[in-house]
Structures are given as structure tokens and as C-alpha cells.
Amino acid sequence: MSEAEAGVDVRVPPLGDFKDVPVIAILATVGQTVAENDALVTLESDKATIDVPAPFAGVVREILVKVGDRIGEGTLIARIAYTGEAPVTPAPVAPTTGTVASDTTARTEDTIRMQRPAAIDAAQITGADEPAFDVFYPLVVFGAGPGGYTAAFRAADLGLTVGLIERSPTLGGVCLNVGCIPSKALLHAARVIDEAASMANFGIAFGAPQIDLERLRAWKNRIVNRLTSGLNSLAKQRKVEVVRGEARFVSAHRIAVTDANGTRVVGFEQCIVAAGSEPVRLAGVPDDPRIIDSTGALELAARPARMLVIGGGIIGLEMGCVYSALGTRVTVVELSPGLMPGCDPDLVRPLEKRLRAHYEAIYTGIKVAAVEATPEAIRVTFEGAGAPEPQAYDRVLLAVGRRPNGGSLAIEVTGVEVDARGFLPVDRQMRTRVSHIFAVGDVAGGPMLAHKATHEGKVAAEVAAGLKRAFDARVIPSVAYTDPEVAWVGLTESEAKAQGIPYGKAAFPWIASGRSLAINREEGFTKLLFDPDTHRVLGGGIVGTNAGDLISEVTLAIELGADASDIGLTIHPHPTLSETVAFAAEAFEGTLTDLYIPKKG
């Protein structure tokens, strides 16, 4: 009996941080025919249940674990005999032209059957104008942030063989490693500190917090490590090959990837560029370890006594909230007339009022004229009406925005356009002007948001796999995870006024919300903008606790073309913050009973 007939070992794939987990269910039986990805057993951690799938279609010969067994990565759980042909291994290719990565497994997506491209003869790919490659993939994804790994995983699910190029040691990009995720962990800690202090007004007093920066950093890093480990597992499960190193294009179908061992040339048929962005650094600012960007701020190397945040946008204000809660005296300086440019001023006001009570100072309409590093401190000089005298700070955080990485990829050799700001212009299918090269995320223009990147990544992957898809989202929500949070989506009031767009508006103040009063956070409000004729939702904004979670209802309403009555007539649970969205809609319709609004005329 051959190995395929006797059964091939099936082992537990990598599970991230979960090294010792119990088996809670056996989902297959000996003699059962299973399809690829059918669940064989279910494991349970303290946070989630995990199904271990069949890696290929076949007949179960043995089940080698039972309910209650504690197992981990690599544990032998079953043996499965192949039905039909075993997976095909490509024939070796002459080393002068490289090796070819391929997989001929077929998969089904709805009614569309996608076949992974067969092994490609290197001689057919390498032309006179193309250098030889060391490895070839039908699809290469350049960058493993939210847009990149989403594109890679979706493409693999659709049957493509994917190479994922990433320069960092871990997957997840800026968002997961040094952005969205670690910052939200620290913002949660900051909120707990502030809420504990506020409870003294209600008869519950705590002592001053004892802050152990080393343990706080370790907790933040554990969260990041769990998620990056999860991405590694997902890549392995999907057979996405990760190629690590600094990368640059060398031709229309080749990318050179350099690491400590040298340079490899990766060939591809199609490529999705998801190379992200980097922080902008102000000209004239000295190179000093006390002058940091958002990545440095998240490292929590120290708890400075006094810190200046240059930039009053989302990143600067979020990090200001963290350091203020940890005991640092924070000053924010913003060149624009107000904080958080792009957001309606009325939404920013409750946040600014709270921040002014916690921060040392907030300066708007003020320019940083000079930054000098001295042995004692960082001295900063300001310009503008009402500018303070030169000040000395222990830390200076540069948070003046980010720039796309499109200009650092050498992608011009492919014929792809790079605009003056470093963006790669794309169409609604996320294609650049070179049809086999796509771009998603920060390099593709538009708001630099992880949730936009993931949607674009899916579109690009599906188009690359031959599906008819386009990025057709009507709106993309924005969230500042400050305290209070600020979130908005769709048409803003400022945009409507500037563009002369007619609109109707209704707002519900949280001071009239039982839920917001119960949690002692009455400073917020919810507002909605409507088409004055059809009453359809055009946009909305929320400031207050968990605004980032609440804005999704407004986003869905806009996507579905809902009007005020659709929202108002939807029963919302009481008492909740989510019902403030319904109350705002009712206010526009004139049916609200939780406030008295005199009738006009």
C-alpha cells in the first residue's frame, strides 16, 4: 500500500500564542470522505475556538486524538488518504533561470471555478528585456500591511499562488505593529486611568496609579505578537509564501528583494502594490533621540515630564491622550486654525474642551519656527499671533502627517505613473495604468486608513483572479480614538457649505441620553445630515464615548440609501448610545419625544 493510500499525516498548524489547548470536538470519523478545508477537530483557547481543517480532499484513515486531549502546534491528529491525484510538485527548473512556485489545486468561489495557474516554464517568461528570476509567482503582493495581507489571503482563497513580499520581520504593516493596534491598547490604558480618577466625584476613590512602563510595554507587545502570529498562521494555512527583504522593481515583471543573505529576483505575472506610507519629517528638525515620530511614541521608552506634540491631527491627539494620562504635561501646536483639520469644528469642540482641561496648552494657528537640541532639553520657538515664548521640552513628537511610499519603489521602470506626492493613480478596479499591476492602501491615494486598504485589497485580489469587481464603496468612515472619540462619515457640514450642497441637519445631545449620563460622559452628541428632498442620509458625525463603534450604523445607512424614517423606525435597544443615532433621525422627522423641539413657524 502506497503512502497516499495508507494516509498522510495531518498535524496542528501554527496557532500563534496558543501552545497547549484542549480538543473539544471531533468532527470527522474514520472512513469519512472529506473535502479540502473540511474541519477535522475543534480546539478551544481561553479566547477563541479553532477548527483544524483537512489540507486536501481524501478519506480519513485514522483519528489520533480524542476530546479532552491537550495538544499544540505540530501534534499529529489524523491520517488522510488522497482521493484522486496527489498535489502536483512542479518539475525542477534550470538554476540559471530560477524555480517556479505553483499549485494546481482547484477551488470554487460561488459559481465561478478558478484554477491555480500551472507551473510556468521559466524560458517562456524570461524575455530579452527581463532579467532571470530566482522564484516566480503568478501573483506577488508587495507589502504585508492590512491591504497587502488581505489581498494575498483573498487571492489564495480564489486559487492563485501568491508570494507576499515584506521588509519587516512580522506581517501586519504599520497598523498592526506600530500604529492602530498598539495605540488602541495604550489608549485603553489611558482611559482606565482617567475613569478611575473621575470616580472620586461619585464616592469611589482610588489611590494614584502606580505605572510600570516595562509591564505596560510588555502588555502592548503581547497584543501585537498575538496578532502577528495569527497572520503568520493564516499565511501558512493558505500556502502564501512570505519573501522577506527590501524590495524594488527592476522591470515590468521582476522585483529584486535584498536581505542579509543577498539579493533574489522574484518574477510575477501580476502584482498588487501595498507598500504603505511613512511619517513626514519637518525640514530643519535635528536628528535627536528625544524627537520622535508615532513609532517612537508607541515604544514608551520613557515617561517625559513635558512633551510637545507638533500636529493637532488624529495621530498627535491620540498620542497626547496616552502621555497625558501617564502623567506627562502635554502641549499641542497646530498650524491650522483648529484641531483635526477635515473634521467639522462642532464635533471637535467637546474634545478640545476636555483636552484643554487635561493638557498643559493647545496652540492653533501657530507655526513651529525652530527646533534646537541642547544637552538639557529640546528648545522650540513659535511664530504667529498669540505664540508663546520659546519653550523647553523633554520630548517632541512629530505628528504632521504621512507620505506614501510610491516614490521609493523604483516602480517607474514598469511604466506605472507616480504622481508628485508619491501616490500611484488607480482606477476603480485598483489597476494602475499598467494593467497587470495594481495598487491599494496608502499608496493608492485617498484617506490613509487601514479599513479602506483592506477593502481595496480584496477588490484587487478578486480582479486579479478574474472576477468582475470594483471599489464601489460610497463612503469611508474616519475615527479619532481620542477621549472622547470623534467619528464621521460621508458628507461633512463644512464640505456641504463650501460646495453649496443643500442639506438638512438634526442632532441629538448626549446630555439627554440616559446611557451617557449613567457613564458620566454627557459631553457628546450625534448629528446626521440629510437630503432635504428625499430625506436620505448624506453624512453623519458623532463625538463621545465609543463614537468609532457607533459610526458604522451611519455608514451602513448611507451605503443602503436609507432615509431618516428607516433609522427612526428601527427599534434600538434602550438605554444605549446607539439609540442617539435613531433620536437624531427622529429629530429630523419631527417625531422625537425624548426632547422638546418647538415646531418651526
Regions found by a protein language model. Name each.
Residues M1-T42, D51, P55-A57, D103-T104, ...:
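Acidic, low-complexity mobile loops and tails
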Residues L15, I26-V34, V65-I71, G84, ...:
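Acidic, glycine-anchored pre-beta loop/turn
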Residues A35-P53, G72-A86:
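Short hydrophobic beta/alpha edge segments that flank linear recognition/processing sites
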Residues R116-D121, I125-Y137, F153-R303, S336-M340, ...:
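Glycine-rich flavin
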Residues E130-G147, R303-I315:
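Beta1/beta-strand and adjacent pyrophosphate-binding region of the FAD-binding site
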Residues V140-F142, A247, V265-G276, V309-I310, ...:
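Short hydrophobic core segments
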Residues F142-A144, A151, A156-S168, V174, ...:
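Flexible, glycine-rich terminal cap/loop adjacent to redox cofactors
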Residues D288-P304, P390-V463, A557:
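FAD-site-proximal beta/loop scaffold in flavoenzymes
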